[in-house]
């Protein structure tokens, strides 16, 4: 049994800006896995940090934990225009992931936000909550054990799903459903169909493609992810997600690119490469788990 003192000690690592960012990320994911009020309190306190990357990951983890106790803090972040768009976006997505309809009115209001990534996120979260109300239950569990912003489409033909995915005239929710169906199907054709989505018009959509490709860990999409990370014209939110995907795929073909962009002028890209290089080492090393905060306490 993990004690509250141990949770608090892991929280201290998370909240210590003097610690290397990869160590703080590992502490965060340990807290996510442990759950409970003390873990949530530590995570919420991190929203005062200066790193948009870390704050966005805090919101992501709170959404994946699906604990209603996080709702007030996430609402505060979503409504705080001083927070970076990628942080507000992740707070909106987390509110959709938790799945409590009490936040619908706020999400509908922010579906008109002037920051397009925030508006699109809240539109998706509203549709997810409406889908849950219509179907009365969560979609079947993801093979990746993640809570996704849209349930997977029931279609299983890769070409049909690719057509929906890339159809800019379709509602974003439908395209996301195609995205998660392709991810769940897996295989080279599905990976390449998803990688084509990195050319889509919506930065939010492109960033989600990067995230999904990172989950799949298939080397077939390394050239497309590398091109997106290398593009200075690309939205930093997309570049960051592509960097982390390369760290997750963790093949030698990813390493040189991550090292090159670990000095990028965009802080979120720089930090993402730092975290991705740590993930690369984990994927290629002997460590039992990435979320190793408890092991570090006992070392």
Curated annotation (Swiss-Prot):
Cofactor: binding details: Binds 2 Fe(2+) ions per subunit.
InterPro entries noted in UniProt: ARM-like, ARM-type_fold, Deoxyhypusine_hydroxylase, Lipovitellin_superhlx_dom, PBS_lyase_HEAT
A molecular-function term among this protein's GO annotations: iron ion binding
GO process terms (BP): peptidyl-lysine modification to peptidyl-hypusine
Residues given in the record as Fe cation 2 binding sites: 89-90, 207
EC annotation from Swiss-Prot or TrEMBL: 1.14.99.29
Catalytic activity: [eIF5A protein]-deoxyhypusine + AH2 + O2 = [eIF5A protein]-hypusine + A + H2O
Keyword match Transmembrane: no
Spans of repeat HEAT-like PBS-type: 54-80, 87-113, 174-200, 205-231, 238-264
UniProt pathway: Protein modification; eIF5A hypusination
The entry's keywords: Hypusine biosynthesis, Iron, Metal-binding, Monooxygenase, Oxidoreductase, Repeat
Residues annotated to bind Fe cation 1: 56, 240-241
Superkingdom, natural source: Eukaryota
Cofactor(s) the protein requires to work: Fe(2+)
Function noted in UniProt: Catalyzes the hydroxylation of the N(6)-(4-aminobutyl)-L-lysine intermediate produced by deoxyhypusine synthase/DHPS on a critical lysine of the eukaryotic translation initiation factor 5A/eIF-5A. This is the second step of the post-translational modification of that lysine into an unusual amino acid residue named hypusine. Hypusination is unique to mature eIF-5A factor and is essential for its function.
Similarity comment text for this entry: Belongs to the deoxyhypusine hydroxylase family.
Protein's recorded name: Deoxyhypusine hydroxylase
Gene behind the chain: DOHH
